[in-house]
Design a protein with these regions (language model features):
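Glycine-rich beta-strand-to-loop/alpha-helix junction loops that act as flexible
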Residues: 37-42
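Short N-terminal binding/cap micro-motifs at the start of the first secondary-structure element
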Residues: 45
């Protein structure tokens, strides 16, 4: 049985960030069911990842989201320090000395009801993209920025795939043309610093894992 996240995070600042993420997810799930979590936090909290993620990526297609979110956040003691709507929408939420970034995208997505693991080990049900859809997003993310973390997330998500036919073609094309990670975007040492449990795989081992999964 896995230990609670609070027992294994390496730094106090990480724990405070993770706790704030939990509070924000509580706010989101209380104000709307027209949402779907995605990105690294979805992989970490819903699909048993072991990579610390510092922000929240979420699809939101609810009306009056801004007003509802600001009001609900204030009600639980969270300070919305920035809410930018021009270009790429993002929100900054702060509590005490900890601040996180939320990137809500106004797009309706099919989502699964899944348990989200909180810092203390308890779980709440939320709506999240399927592992197959997350893999397709992560393939695009890796091709765009070539960060170790995206490749790692793919290997984690493959353990939860229920419909292999949805991703096999994309994965075959991906590994056939894959380029090595860009150390200027995320160095291997930076990648190692955010993996808090288990072996930190090399680029070669992660590609090997994906190829083996397809056999």
């Amino acid at each position: 049985m896995d230990l609670p996240i609070s027992n294994v995070l390496k730094r106090g600042s990480e724990l405070e960030t993770a706790q704030l993420e939990d509070e924000v997810m509580g706010v989101l799930t209380n104000i709307t069911d027209k949402m779907a979590l995605h990105g690294g936090t979805a992989v970490w909290r819903c699909y048993n990842g072991k990579r610390f993620s510092t922000d929240i990526d979420v699809y939101i297609w609810a009306e009056d989201f801004k007003d509802k979110f600001i009001h609900a956040a204030a009600g639980v003691g969270l300070d919305v320090t920035k809410f930018r709507e021009k270009g790429v929408t993002f929100i900054h939420v702060k509590k005490n000395n900890t601040e996180i970034k939320i990137e809500p995208r106004n797009a309706e997505k099919y989502a699964l009801l899944m348990p989200y693991e909180r810092v203390d080990g308890s779980k709440i049900n939320i709506l999240v993209l399927s592992p197959e859809d997350l893999i397709l997003e992560k393939i695009d993310a890796y091709n765009d920025r070539r960060a170790y973390k995206d490749l790692y997330d793919i290997t984690i998500l493959l353990n939860s795939v229920k419909q292999p036919c949805k991703v096999k073609g994309a994965l075959q094309e991906f590994v056939k043309n894959i380029q090595t990670p860009d150390e200027n975007i995320q160095s291997y040492s930076e990648f190692k610093a955010v993996i808090y449990a288990g072996i930190v795989p090399t680029y070669q081992k992660m590609v090997e894992f994906i190829k083996r999964w397809q056999m």
